[in-house]
Amino acid sequence: MSPISIILFNRGLARAAFVFAAIATLGLSADAQQQQTQPAQEKSSSEKAVEPENKQSEADKRVEMNLLGKTNAAAGENRRNENIQFNLVNNNALKDLNVRLGTTATIVREFDPANGYFGAEFGNAPKSSISVPPPIKSGFHGQLYDTHQNSVTTARSFFQVGGVKPAHENDYGFNLGFVVWRNAKFFIDVSQQKIRGSVNGNVLVPTPDERAPLVTDPATLAIVARFLNAYPKELPNRTDIDPRALNTNAPQSIDNNQANIRLDQVLGSKDSVALQYQFTSQSVDAFQLVAGQNPDTDTKSHLARIVWTRSWDAKTITTFSIGYDRLTSLLRPEENAVGPFVSTSGLTSLGPDGTIPLNRAQNQIRTATQIRSTQGAHDWSAGFGLTRRQVNGDETDVHRGFFSFANDFGVDAVTNLRMGRPSQYIASIGDIHRGFRLWDAQLYAGDKFQVNPRLNLVYSLRWQPATKPTEVNNLNVIPYDSDWNNLAPSFGFAYRISKKLGVLRGAYGVHYGEIFFVTYQQIRFSPPLNTKTVVTAPNLLDPLGTGAGGQIPLALPTIYALDPKLATPYSHQYNLSWEPDWNKSARLQFGYVGSRSHKLLSMWYLNRAHPTPGVPQTTETINQRRSDPEIADYRLVVNGSRGYFDAARVSLVLPGWKGLNIDASYWFSKAIDLGSSYTNTANEIDSRKGRSQNEFETQRDMKGLSDFDQTHAFLWRMSYLFRQTKLPRLMSTLIDGWNISTVVLVKTGTPFTVGSGSDAPGFGNVDGNGGDRPNLVDPTILGRTIADPDTSRQLLPSSSFQFINPTDARGDLGRNVFRKGPIHNVNASLHRSWGFKKDLRFTFRAESINLFNTPQFAEPGFDLSNPNFGAITNTLNEGRTFRFTLQIGW
């Protein structure tokens, strides 16, 4: 623990807790900082001074690098419950934020042609083709800070058994700016975050009478015993939730490091050059509630930029930049992992999942140029950007092997595990190292035209071609062509109606996304260089060898394919807003934002097993009942989904009224898709989330609410600065200068789907794929919010559903027709700065996240065949936390 942290905990914790209790009693609310679009990082006072030096935004880094330990407290976010694990690659952090918090309906005032706005209507930051850094502040300036959080002041999460385990978090750093020589300014920013904690969570483990193998063969018994011994020795202690529920703890450590260096040089009266290098890393020694459950992760990011700016005259500026980005990700199994990935219905899986290990390096070489010129009533801009993308490394697809134990063969899944009788085995063998290359480009031009004092127009055209990826050693050939017709027009206007009626604004634009690397790289897993084999009802001891009775199992390869017509996803985004000028002290906005997204990525699971005359409809005969008897699944990536989003939003900003700042927003929205949203990569978990019950009529079967849909959302932020209070002198001296701020976030819960939980006869359609849903018996339960552990089973009774017959194609229950519990969160902070001498200041800040210790419940058990169906067993957030910051700035 750092010296500053020790001082804080020896002298201030009890008093700070009392202050926050008083704040809660008074009902103070909301931080008046400008709202950050989700997702973003929690910002304390120690971080804000760094931003003008053009440190890459923490929001972007959090999503790009999948950083843990970050919370956007200013937007009402609570600290996430770390026991809801996701692999720290791809865009998994963004998807976690969307499902856990939902999205923020965002009205973009105007579309800058230099930026890409795909997904911006949901609150995501636009992607810029060129970044022009703001100048470094003049003079000698800097700051030193330390933020500390400790389990001493942390409340238990809702389901936690026993006290909070010892944990602490330190976030400390410094930044410094000064003139190094004539017309040259230097800036450095260095920080570290050390998290040493204990993750609490519920896992499903065998009951006392399920801990012994039921198999007698010594070799098979050894494997079954190894699987069973991977579960904690502790017995279930939350049998009120589920007969197998165990609440337990496991240690986790996270190290985050960041360094940012800038040098700005003025070259004469017209030219300036900025050089920047930024390094970010994260190392995660993951928690293991079950032995080997989660991978350990090392992530490193390097960013280098050179930006040359030339002012030709007072009206024309050109900018040229060249940059290099490198992101490396290494995910590896923990040493106690059992080897293969083992999934048992009714128990926590033995991981990590089939994509581990993973070793990936991504390089981007960027160059861009831009010109802006003002000519009379026109403000012209044009630019060009070119990016060379390189991705190298090893990716896996159950190369460690995968066993599935399901409710099958007339008994439950745990009994099948104890008997060593899996329903399915999948394994991949082959060369998994690849190197892919492609070019991205942007060419754009636009104009801001002031038609008259009351009307402004904005219009632009952006061309965003994407070339066909290539594999450097020609080991794989991408079947689709380069996408050359990605034209993206945009238009906007601002019209002042009258003095009191204010301004009417509108904007429309076409915006393109991307075909993700993780999407097209899957072709590496197809024959002939790689074979993914599926065996039904295998022999546990030798799943690819001879089975019972000396018979060789029917093992078939899985094919990964890309649609030859695969194209870049895009969206039409539009908004209309009215900003009346009824009061000079307040800003009010009424608005609508909508989008229609097309060609969203999804994976279709084809060549499934179908009812065949004369062949029993059982798990053992799945491979015999496929249309193409030579292969197992044919997994085809297509532009198979569309997205629909509409939202109405009203916002009120009251800045600086007698020390009071208020920022409040409410939005009413609806998001629908055909199984895949704008974040779907059509890979692994994403592909299964978008998998239909049957291979036919996929879009009809999957149409429903998006995973991040929320009907209502309300964000209220308020801060108050005590100054010149009319109190006795001593009290006024103690109170004046303190700033109290609070953030209140209230949102509808996001939706979830009830599934059958098994593809086996008596549960599913026995087609070799999961995703089956039951039939609905009681339609009155549709749309229910399952938000209370005490009533969840009553609100979602198993009697309201019925398993389908083995020969039925699908169940009639829709996708995402129920909702998990809502978000009710309050964050608060108290801070004050003291000035000493010239420009020297000292700041103390105390913050609480989830001030009222309100749980945000996860969805209940949603697999009808499992004993925990309908039971809420987890929360999406942590309990109340406090943290304290000391900062010295000059």
Language-model regions, residue ranges each:
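Short, solvent-exposed micro-motifs at the edges of structured domains
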Residues: H168, K468, A567-Q573, P580-W890
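Repeated loop/turn-to-beta-strand initiation elements of outer-membrane beta-barrel proteins
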Residues: A184-F186, K270-L275, K315-T318, H378-W380, ...
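Residue-level signature of outer-membrane beta-barrel architecture
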Residues: P133, F178-V179, Q265, R310, ...
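Transmembrane beta-barrel strands of outer-membrane/channel proteins
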Residues: L144-N150, I188-Q192, L275-F279, F320-R326, ...
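Solvent-exposed loop/turn elements at secondary-structure boundaries
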Residues: P340-S343, E471-A488, G492-V638, N769-G771, ...
